[in-house]
Regions:
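Alpha-helical transmembrane segments of polytopic membrane transporters and translocases
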Residues: 2, 15-17, 29-46, 73-80, ...
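Alpha-helical transmembrane segments of multi-pass membrane transport and lipid-handling proteins
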Residues: 68-123, 150-158, 209-217, 290
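Residue-level signature of transmembrane alpha-helical entry/exit and packing/kink sites
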Residues: 73, 107-111, 167, 196, ...
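Membrane-proximal transmembrane or re-entrant/amphipathic helices at the cytosolic face
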Residues: 184-194, 216-291
Length: 291
């Protein structure tokens, strides 16, 4: 496990080394601010789930059917949230940066937009460790991390001619390219394949693409799309664009699932996680067991 975290730490800093070496301090500063916001989404959205999910998966490791059921539902909840956040930040990322950091960081906003498409997939990739650890295979996790690092580093080098924006896009491409192989490799010892992941999350991915495209079509060419300068204008753009996107997204998810099951699963997961953040209590029943 420690070896995996060591390799992962180097991978998470290689992009900074390459951008700083190839360009200049200003370019690195803009890139680093954009990356920090990108990484923050993973830590804020998946960290509260780590202990709950790992504990439940470990308890289910000797019951393959229960483990698969729990994992499928948990992946669905992560995808429900992650795909929405990723698509929405692709639409309003530059406005979020202008609101949080100020107008002088506009270049970071343009870089951050290229991280956006990878956020949802990054959240799914971050759950691969749950499988490796719950079935007692940390060595496989380390080996996969080394392969992942080699591929991602190669993409960074290939993307350098396009500047910091190219490196940001390389992150998104790497997550999208590796997510299915990552789950296939993690799930081999327990008979899970890449199709298991696809079946659990494809509706959320499709909903985010459709809702994002519809929202962009509505606002393209308007003053909102042109992102006028100013913190107040940025906040207004975020609120209007995100409201329209979320409406389309939730509606599409409900249509694709023929009902509100994803909303009930999300509510169940929130109930499971919330008590653990404010008080210690016995482990809750897995979210995968909700009817």
């Amino acid at each position: 496990v420690y070896g995996r975290f060591g390799v992962n730490y180097f991978a998470k800093n290689l992009d900074n080394l390459l951008v700083g070496w190839r360009f200049n301090a200003a370019a690195l500063g803009y890139y680093k601010k954009a990356y920090d916001l990108f990484a923050l989404s993973a830590s804020q959205l998946t960290s509260p789930l780590d202990n709950v999910a790992l504990s439940a998966l470990s308890r289910s490791s000797h019951d393959p059917d229960r483990l698969k059921r729990y994992l499928a539902n948990t992946l669905g909840v992560v995808a429900f949230i992650g795909m929405a956040v990723g698509a929405d930040l692709t639409l309003v990322g530059k406005d979020v940066v202008r609101l949080v950091l100020g107008p002088k960081w506009a270049e970071s906003g343009r870089i951050f937009e290229l991280f956006g498409p990878g956020i949802g997939v990054m959240l799914l990739c971050s759950t691969v460790g749950w499988i490796h650890l719950s079935i007692g295979k940390p060595g496989r996790w380390l080996r996969w991390t080394i392969v992942e690092f080699a591929i991602t580093a190669s993409l960074f080098v290939l993307a350098l001619p396009w500047g910091p924006k190219g490196v940001a896009a390389a992150w998104s491409v790497s997550y999208c390219a590796l997510v299915v192989p990552a789950f296939w490799y993690a799930g081999r010892p327990i008979g899970l394949g890449g199709s298991f992941l696809v079946a659990a999350v494809w509706r959320y991915a499709a909903a985010s693409l459709l809702a994002g495209a519809a929202t962009a079509a509505i606002f393209r060419g308007t003053l909102i799309w042109s992102s006028p300068a100013g913190v107040g204008a940025a906040l207004e753009t975020i609120m209007i664009t995100s409201s329209v996107f979320v409406t389309f997204y939730v509606g599409t998810v409900i249509l694709l699932h023929w009902g509100c099951a994803p909303l009930r699963q999300l509510a169940g997961l929130l109930r499971e996680v919330a008590p653990k953040r404010i008080a210690t209590s016995p482990a809750a029943e897995p979210v995968g067991e909700y009817k």
